[in-house]
Amino acid sequence: MHRSISIRILITNLMIVILGLVGLTGNAIVFWLLLFRLRRNAFSIYILNLALADFLFLLCHIIASTEHILTFSSPNSIFINCLYTFRVLLYIAGLNMLSAISIERCLSVMCPIWYRCHRPEHTSTVMCAMIWVLSLLLCILYRYFCGFLDTKYEDDYGCLAMNFLTTAYLMFLFVVLCVSSLALLARLFCGAGRMKLTRLYVTITLTLLVFLLCGLPCGFYWFLLSKIKNVFSVFEFSLYLTSVVLTAINSCANPIIYFFVGSFRHRLKHQTLKMVLQSALQDTPETPENMVEMSRNKAEL
């Protein structure tokens, strides 16, 4: 039994390292292009910060998994506490970024005149700064009440209350993501003034879908199910391994989505990574007139 568990842990950590290296490369490319090569807009600022959060999140995963593989034992608890604290911070920040992207996109479609005329110029930058501060605050409170992997806090009511509070916050963000996504879908397919499909909309939709499938369930496990051990003790270890792999997949998938959407129906031999990413964030419908204009712009790059 112990040998079987050790093999499962080894395989899981190897998968995380492989996924992490792929994700690190992709997120680093996205971050570099958005920071230095592309003109930033409201949505690209969120994507830039999301790529940074995913990059650091995967880096934490790789460090923890590599130490597990090399030592074949539980790593130093102080180091793991710090690493886990940072991972929770990055996870919450990434979820907040996705929620902000979804809300911003919904406002741009539902209230286009207000969005273009009255939206403050630096809203995205201010929102990203507030998201990092809020995520840090939640993480500090969580560590204060729970101490994370320290077993002496297992029966602490303050820790349990903080877990339920954090889970309620995750559920609130889940509702925000669902409502804003459904509103966009309704605007896309229903009504007289239907929204025209753009690559930016496809990029955001696929990113949210991957997070809902791979990222959000893991948050519920980390903050809620792992604390109710009397009910979930039989499945706890398997759920933990699954949650870790799924979070790695989620952070690894975003750059792949950007480059897939950006290169779809385009000839790759004439496309640079900069052009592909720019195309993935394109918020204009691909009518024949727009296609001609975009071809001219790309030729000038």
UniProtKB/Swiss-Prot annotation:
Expressed in a subset of sensory neurons that includes nociceptors. Expressed in the subclass of non-peptidergic sensory neurons that are IB4(+) and VR1(-). It is a multi-pass membrane protein. Its main location: membrane. It is found in: Cell membrane. Signal peptide: none annotated. One of its GO terms (molecular function) is G protein-coupled receptor activity. Residues 1-15, 64-77, 150-163, 225-240 are extracellular. CDD domains: 7tmA_MrgprA. The chain crosses the membrane at residues 16-36, 43-63, 78-98, 129-149, 164-184, 204-224, 241-261. One of its GO terms (cellular component) is plasma membrane. Keywords: Cell membrane, G-protein coupled receptor, Membrane, Receptor, Transducer, Transmembrane, Transmembrane helix. Residues 37-42, 99-128, 185-203, 262-301 are cytoplasmic. InterPro entries: GPCR_Rhodpsn, GPCR_Rhodpsn_7TM, MRGPCRA, MRGPCRFAMILY. Belongs to the G-protein coupled receptor 1 family. Mas subfamily. PANTHER family: MAS-RELATED G-PROTEIN COUPLED RECEPTOR, MAS-RELATED GPR, MEMBER A2A-RELATED. Orphan receptor. May be a receptor for RFamide-family neuropeptides such as NPFF and NPAF, which are analgesic in vivo. May regulate nociceptor function and/or development, including the sensation or modulation of pain. This is Mas-related G-protein coupled receptor member A6. It comes from Mus musculus.
